[in-house]
Amino acid sequence: MLNLNLRTAFLITKAVIPSMVEHKQGKIVHIASRTGLKGEATVGPYSISKAGVIRLTETIAEEVRDYGINCNCVMPSVIDTEANRKAMSDADFSKWVRPEEIARVILFLCSDDAKIINGAAIPVYGQS
């Protein structure tokens, strides 16, 4: 999980920052999880990796703020996907956040309207 979630976020961020610094602007949005704030017993490695993504976001935000770059993350709860519906068939899907709802939050964070938001971990929990 650390390799997949945290290392991947780190390497992609490391790859895009030089161009953003050169252009004196940029938006980085990582995908974390609500479990990154409070671990859950059944998904320990996942929680740890997502906590790392949140700390990575905060650290990068501080490091690049003077270059006109914002770095934030979104923390979805359970996402309404086909795979999750199969895995949790007894759950109330009506309360889950949909992928397009997460996308709208990400689009906002990438907009000029969000230029004052930097280093934030935005919860996207729906009604769960």
What are the residue ranges of the model-derived segments?
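C-terminal helical subdomain
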Residues: 66, 73, 81, 91-127
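Residue(s) in the substrate-gating loop at a strand-loop-helix junction
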Residues: 33
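Helix-to-beta-strand junctions that scaffold the AdoMet/dcAdoMet cofactor pocket
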Residues: 20-23, 65
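Active-site helix of classical SDR
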Residues: 13, 49
